[in-house]
Amino acid sequence: VTTSTDHGRSDLESSSLALTRDGRSVSDRGDTVCVIGAGASGLTAIKNLTEHGFGVDCYERETGVGGAWNWRHDRSPVYASTHLISSRPFTQFPDFPMPDDWPDYPHHSQLLSYLERYAEHFDLRRHVWFGTEVVRVEPADGDRWDVTTRSTGGYGPERTSRYAAVVIANGHNWSPKLPDYEGLAEFRGEAMHASSYQDPAQLRGKRVLVVGAGNTGCDIAVEAAQQASRCWHATRRSYWYAPKYVLGRPVDQINDVLLALRVPRRVRQWLYHLTLRLTVGDLTRFGLARPDHRMLETHPIVNSQLVHYLGHGRVTPVPDPVRFHPHSVELADGRRIDPELVVFATGYLPRFDFLDPKILGDDGTVGRPVLWLNAFAPNHPTLAVAGLVQPDSGMFPLSHWQTVLFARLLRSRVTRPGRAAGFAAAVVARAGERYAGPVRDSSRHWFEVGHVDYLRALQRALHDLEAK
């Protein structure tokens, strides 16, 4: 197990001993903050907390930084061809730009390199215990937290440490949302979730059914069009497929100009519909149903190639499956198809197995946390979740400002307790607020945010916390 050199000293040097509420021994880490996960959100949490004067212990179950972007990790959802769908300027951290000579949409290997250089530049690895998983996070007296860890895989003894605060940054794109189709267990072909997809060679020469029309599903359908003997693409509803470039610029940069000009949502929707009409035309002629929603009412699907392969007959759109048979799949329109391989690109669900779900406002039946700013839990002022957002553009800047806000909140609890109390009251009153226009009610959109609206909300919270 690789641990931080800063934490290599003995408990007697670095901690005092206490007891948990049920009598277990615990090492008290004083004012140190615990960060769970060393992906993009965890790394920026470490940086911002240390820059505000806090000690940090970060626990990472894998052997390196990068989280979802580290393809070597068994929980990483990336596959060989994964690229950003948000452009470089909107994805980079505000205080650590990506190289100017990188492409508009960097490859996942470049993203991992970027995060590794970020960790190196800010000397973050010395705060990380690698190969260590968190098994329990429990409230302790005085708004503190008892965090129990062990070596990844369950080897060795458990260890409990007490922290002044906790940042959860374990990601929300690693636990597959698995479908429950009738007869699936009887299917004699191969079936897998997109989390197990890595390389187009898995599709080569096969009859492939891709289920799901998110960005991953569209990417895999395109690769099946290139490699498989036949590809069906099943979707529950039709979507609007946005090109990656409009007027020669990445589409999110065009969108940002409209947002900066405060163009009304209805006008932006009209402009997007006009753009799609001029660029890809009416997709119903390829066999797709007309979408039952307007642009901006679902998470953006950004793919310039799917329409190309629909038009060339290499992808056949079909409705959602309703039942699996041993050698065929029955579709909602009554047709049957005979895929050899089914790939379920049905998304992911958040998991916080180490924490009582009620702490995050979930009653345990839905699995959806109820937080303010998608980060702060009512009645738990020293707990934050970083990166639990699904933005319409880049993610890293949002995690950066989330963790800046949390660091300043922790500092205010000492220097300006009245402001901190006002913040805590706002968390209780405003938990569950949304930061996007009307979107479809589905688990896919639980954490949907418009990046401009969300950044403005974070800026207002920072201003209110620090105003004189």
Segments from the language model and where they lie:
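Active-site segment of extracytoplasmic enzymes that catalyze sulfate/phosphate-ester chemistry
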Residues: 90-91
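Flavin (primarily FAD) cofactor-binding/catalytic cores of flavoenzymes
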Residues: 2-9, 15-84, 97-245, 249, ...
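Short, mixed-charge aromatic SLiMs
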Residues: 425-439
